[in-house]
A protein has these predicted regions:
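Short runs of predominantly hydrophobic/aromatic residues within well-ordered alpha helices
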Residues: 44, 92, 96, 242-245, ...
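Glycine-rich cofactor/substrate-binding loops
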Residues: 2-43, 105-106, 272, 287-470
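Helix N-cap/coil-helix junction residues
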Residues: 56-57, 225, 386, 407
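Generic, well-ordered alpha-helical scaffold segments in large soluble proteins
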Residues: 47, 51, 68-75, 98, ...
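A helix-coil-helix interface module used to build multimeric assemblies
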Residues: 2-209, 214-221, 282-283, 294, ...
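Short, well-ordered beta-strand elements within core beta-sheets of diverse protein domains
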Residues: 49-57, 127, 174, 243-251, ...
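Charged, flexible cofactor/metal-binding loops and thiol motifs
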Residues: 124-129, 136, 151, 158-319, ...
């Protein structure tokens, strides 16, 4: 049998001429959808059993087909050259051709009642469900690294910023757990996308449904789905679950990029808050002193590629009429690439963070900046009945005067402060300490040591719940 005949096997009888060789290479998807071979074999086995139950195959024929599929799957795992040399149009064509070569006419019966349209919609959903589980496992490892660093640095202070300007003091553990909260939401978002994928389109045919007596619910159960699709036309063209998974990956990548940005800044000499591990850093071919945060920079850079995958599929989908269109073939490479990149980014982030050494001396020294307790000065006035807006204005004037006099607010004498408000007294000094500023933020979610300790325990409890769900 010629290559061209093989290429046309699933649909070629209506045509007089073979496909142009350049067009065939352009349109064939085997080179990337071969990744769906495990899902293809699982679907084919379930379909063979379903049509045997429906009387389309005898029990013996169904068993023969399942046995042949098992043998082909075993070969596919042990013979990569077989896969690499294939000229199949797609993953469905590859398996059907091999099955017919093995079983003859019996192998040709397997496609009864189904279409590549409902097959690929089903297999892609199966893939997304497993991919989501893989990403959530990786996120759990990143959350572990965050929890361990937070425990190790539980009471280490640091300057908190807004607009990249010193704002109020924080605990380093509070900063770490802030990132942890974002990643935990990512795990939930990925799970929600997988939930949307947990609907079985198989039995929808090309667009109008299946004409043979099959139990779709039993088929869905065999393939690990929780329900069946409600409308065959929608089922073969729906890629919402793909977009949702790509959106979840894009949001995850955005959170990774923000974590990376913090680390790049904190590792710079101007900050010096963290020593990056040698094994996740690189040097310069010219400047021997350099230790570059390439792990974090690459995480930041790869985020754009994941955004691109999401936008590419949005643009592909926006102009499609109802039902399946060949444009939908473009969904898979976008998702495969985004999944692979996101998975690698999470693994590298977890490993780099776990091996990083935070410099308590630099963090503590930076947290002593008197400007960080300016809010404490206003709060102090409020405790004596001064309205906050008035207190804010008083402290603003104090800060302006201190700057003009070349002093910090801690260096301003009580007598000088009383010129701005008679409320100031000698108990003020204790209110302006770093320890006091941290301790006063004791409500749940705050940066006081006790609040952060409680938050860490709750974070670990939710992490355990995530892991038990995998």
């Amino acid at each position: 049998m010629s290559d061209a005949a093989s290429q046309r096997k699933m649909w070629g009888a209506r045509f007089d001429r073979d496909p142009d060789a350049s067009f065939y290479e352009f349109e064939r998807s085997w080179k990337f959808d071969c990744r769906l071979l495990p899902q293809e074999f699982a679907l084919d086995r379930a379909w063979a059993q379903a049509i045997a139950r429906g009387g389309i195959l005898t029990k013996e024929e169904g068993e023969q087909i399942v046995g042949a599929l098992d043998a082909l799957e075993t070969r596919s795992k042990s013979d990569p050259a077989w896969l690499d040399s294939s000229k199949a149009e797609d993953v469905h064509h590859f398996v059907e051709t091999a099955l017919i070569e093995k079983l003859g006419a019996l192998g040709a019966k397997l496609h009864t009642g189904r279409s590549r349209n409902d097959m690929i919609a089903t297999e892609f959903r199966m893939y997304v469900k497993e991919a989501a589980r893989e990403i959530r496992r990786a996120i759990a490892s990143l959350e572990h690294a965050i929890a361990e660093q937070a425990e190790r640095n539980l009471k280490v202070p640091m300057p908190g910023t807004t607009h990249m300007q010193h704002a109020q003091p924080l605990l380093l553990s509070h900063w770490l757990l802030a990132h942890g909260e974002a990643f935990h939401r990512d795990a939930e978002r990925v799970a929600a996308a997988a939930l949307r994928a947990n609907v079985c389109p198989l039995g929808s045919g090309a667009l109008s449904g299946c004409a043979f007596p099959l139990d779709r619910k039993a088929l869905a159960n065999d393939l690990g789905f929780s329900s069946i699709s409600a409308n065959s036309l929608d089922a073969v063209s729906d890629r919402d679950f793909t977009l949702e998974y790509l959106f979840a990956l894009s949001t995850l990548a955005m959170h990774l990029s923000r974590l990376a940005e913090d680390f790049v800044l904190f590792a710079s000499p101007e900050f010096g808050f963290v020593e990056l591990p040698d094994e996740f850093s690189t040097g310069s071919s010219l400047m021997p002193q350099k230790k570059n945060p390439d792990a974090w920079e690459l995480i930041r850079g790869k985020t754009g590629r994941i955004y691109g995958s999401l936008m590419a599929l949005f643009v592909t989908m926006k102009g499609l009429p109802s039902s399946y269109q060949r444009d939908l073939q473009e969904d898979k490479e976008n998702l495969f690439q985004a999944h692979d990149q996101a998975l690698a980014m999470v693994h590298i982030a977890a490993a780099t963070l776990a091996a990083s050494q935070f410099r308590e001396d630099r963090l503590r020294a930076a947290a002593q900046d008197p400007a960080l307790v300016a809010t404490e000065l206003a709060d102090y006035l409020v405790t004596f009945g001064v309205p906050f807006r008035e207190a804010h204005e008083i402290v603003g004037k104090v800060l302006r005067a201190a700057g003009q006099e070349g002093k910090s607010i801690r260096e301003m004498s009580i007598e000088r402060l009383k010129e701005f408000s008679p409320v100031f007294d000698r108990n003020l000094a204790t209110a302006l300490t770093l320890e006091s500023a941290l301790a006063r933020r004791s409500l749940p979610g705050g940066t006081a040591p006790g609040a952060v300790q409680s938050a860490l325990q709750e974070f670990k409890r939710r992490l355990a719940g995530l892991e038990s769900d995998l």
